[in-house]
Each structure stands twice: as C-alpha cells, then as structure tokens.
C-alpha cells in the first residue's frame, strides 16, 4: 500500500496545516507506512521547507502562477510518477495542487481523500468568495463530491461537510500531537499570572478581545500580563497595538513569531492560553498548550467542548465579558489548582491526540479504502 499526499506549499510560515501534515506523515513512517509527500518549495524567500531532508518529501521548484496557483512542475511530476501509488490524498481545496491530485486519481480509477482543513466551514467559504465561486463551479464541486472520503478533524467539521452537500464517507481523525521535549522553563508560582495568545495575527482571531477583557479587570490589572505571540497581517498588528495604547494598558507584550521548542518554553509559562477566534477547524495550539500543562480558554467557534468535560479549561463564548470572567477565575486560583487543571489537559492529549495513535487511524482508513479490512468506527456514512 503506497500513498501519495499532496499540499500546495510546505513552508514553516504556512502554520498549522503544514505542521500537522508533517507530524502525521512522520508518524505514518514510524508506523511502517509507505507515504510520500509532493509539494512546491516556498515562494517566500524568508520561509523554509519543513522537515529534515526526508527522502519522502518531494519539493518542486515553485513555478505557480495566477490565484489558482497552476504549476507545470507539479503536473509534470504527477504525469511521470502517478502509477506507483495506490491512494492519492490532498490537503486542502481551492488551488491547482488539490485539483490536479483529484483529477489524476479519477483518471487512474484510484481512491482519493481530501483533508479539508476547515476550508468548507461557511465562514471560510465566504472569505474571497468571488474567487472561490467560479473555481467551485469549474472543478472543485466535482472534486469534492466524487472523493472517496473526506477527512475531518472533528464532528463540527463533519457537520459543515454534510451541509455543503457531500454524501460520501467522512473520517473523523484529529490532528496529531507530537509530544514535545519537556520545556526547561517553569510557570512562576508567585509572580504575575500570564495570559497569552499564540497564532497568526488575523482579524478573525479576535485577539483584541483579550485587551477589552483585561481592561474590565480594573484595579486587578496589575496582577497579570498578556503575551501576544505571532505574526500576520501588518495592518491588524498595528490595530492591536493601537488598541493597547488607546486603552492605556501597560502590561501587554508583543513577542513576535515563535515556533519549535521556543514555542513550548513560552506556553509552559502561561497561566492560561486564550483562543478567542471566530472559528478554528481544530486549533493545534490548543493541544500544544495542553501538552505542557497549560489550561486553555477556547471560543465556541472551536471544537473544544472537551475542555469543559475534562475540567482542563474553558469552552465558552469569546466575549470580552467572558474573557474577563475567566481571567478573574485564574487570578483567584492557587498554583496547585492551576497545576491540577493542567495535568488533566496533558493526560487528555496523551490519551486521545498522540501522533502515533492518529497515524494508526489513518492507516486503518487507507486499508479500508483499498477493501482490506472492516470499516473503522471513526468513518461515518450517510
């Protein structure tokens, strides 16, 4: 069983989609899976290709053109090498790489899988709809509807896939979490409580709600500080800094882009991570924070009801009032209470989201698609 996964770009700056794809593929190889990845080199000269030079990563010169990102290099490689693969699996929709993967699979009569990575959420489809509508009519509606399976990371995403109209099998397999090297940094038991955001700076992340929540703490503001970790749209970052200045907040720090082990060294120092986004398909940062014992507050636009069920955080509306309420709860919690909450989160991640367990589910899915085994319990049919 030989699998080809494809993705439009594989640069570190692409964020969660590339990271979770790399983590899954690495775990698949450790499980004995025969999986290759086909992608294009990053166009941004400041970006770098993820990975460590693995032979299974085929990164082609990036010759993509037009908003559709047509690539003659990608097409040429597929034309030459397609016959050696049993299943094709693409990560995402809307770009030529995704369409070409689906077309090639249909041409060969081989099964293909699409991991939608949240791109069929209503809010995601609405963004740049003027670009997506003609592409949907021309090719992507067919690509999606004729897929042998769509991969969703949570039940919420599957519901949006069904609402889109897809009636084929949907596999719910979470994004994998590679448990990090234990950070050397520690949360200060006696210092200020630290609240944080880590992710791409974009208006839909609603980072400003942290500032509005902090402003509501009034005289208790001095008991805490906020770390904003990430980069993104320059105009949005400027807006955030202007809001901090307008509100007169003195305890907000912008730390810039962090990744790798540095990310975990920062996360472990937080008293709580806040994810106040409009929506998140999965939200890798949630499992990353939980994996080092940091409680998380995530908005109802994320699929993280488990935070409430497992008592390792807060899943609630991301209004400034609710954020302020969570901040006050954390300020009133002892170090022991925070540590116990963090340990529950860490245990949940290790039990349900560890990369090797996720990779095993993906291998089960591939085997089932090739008529080798029973339908897995995580595959849902209409």
Regions inferred by a protein language model and the residue ranges of each:
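Conserved donor-binding/catalytic core segment of Leloir-type glycosyltransferases
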Residues: 4, 177, 186-214, 227
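N-terminal strand-loop element at the rim of the active site
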Residues: 7-14, 20-21, 27-69, 162, ...
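Membrane-proximal helix-turn-helix segments that form the acceptor-binding/catalytic region
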Residues: 107, 133-149
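Carbohydrate-associated surface elements
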Residues: 156, 176
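Nucleotide-activated donor-binding/catalytic signature segment of Leloir-type glycosyltransferases, i.e.
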Residues: 238-258
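Short hydrophobic beta-strand element within catalytic cores of glycosyltransferases
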Residues: 295-299
């Amino acid at each position: 069983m030989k699998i080809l996964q494809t993705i439009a770009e594989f640069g570190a700056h692409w964020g969660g989609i590339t990271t979770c794809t790399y983590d899954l593929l690495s775990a698949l190889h450790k499980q004995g899976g025969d999986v290759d990845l086909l992608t294009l080199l990053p166009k941004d000269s400041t970006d770098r290709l993820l990975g460590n030079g693995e032979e299974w990563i085929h990164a082609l010169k990036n010759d993509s053109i037009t908003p559709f990102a047509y690539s003659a290099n990608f097409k040429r490689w597929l034309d030459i090498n397609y016959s050696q693969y049993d299943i094709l699996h693409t990560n995402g929709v809307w770009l030529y790489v995704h369409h070409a993967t689906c077309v090639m699979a249909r041409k060969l009569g081989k099964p293909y899988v699409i991991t939608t990575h949240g791109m069929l959420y209503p809010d995601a489809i609405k963004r740049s709809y003027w670009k997506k509508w003609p592409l949907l009519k021309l090719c992507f509606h067919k690509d999606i509807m004729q897929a042998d399976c769509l991969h969703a990371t949570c039940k919420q995403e599957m519901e949006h896939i069904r609402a889109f109209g897809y009636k084929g099998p949907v596999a719910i397999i979470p994004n994998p979490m590679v448990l990090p090297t234990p950070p050397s940094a520690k949360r200060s038991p006696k210092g200020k409580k630290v609240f944080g955001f880590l992710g791409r700076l974009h208006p839909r992340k609603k980072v400003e709600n942290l500032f509005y929540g902090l402003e509501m703490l009034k005289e208790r503001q001095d008991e805490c500080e906020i770390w904003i970790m990430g980069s993104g749209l320059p105009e949005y970052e400027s807006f955030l800094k202007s809001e901090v200045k307008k509100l007169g907040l003195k305890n907000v720090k912008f730390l810039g882009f962090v990744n790798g082990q540095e990310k975990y060294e920062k996360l472990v120092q937080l008293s709580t991570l806040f994810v106040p986004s409009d929506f998140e398909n999965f939200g890798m940062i949630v499992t990353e924070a939980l994996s080092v014992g940091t409680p998380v507050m995530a908005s109802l636009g994320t699929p993280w009801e488990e935070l409430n069920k497992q008592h390792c955080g807060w899943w609630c509306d991301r209004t400034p009032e609710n954020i302020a309420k969570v901040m006050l709860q954390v300020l009133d919690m002892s170090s022991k209470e925070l540590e116990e909450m963090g340990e529950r989160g860490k245990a949940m991640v290790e039990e349900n989201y560890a990369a090797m367990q996720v990779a095993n589910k993906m291998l089960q899915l591939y085997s089932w698609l090739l008529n080798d085994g029973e339908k897995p319990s995580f595959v849902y049919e209409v």
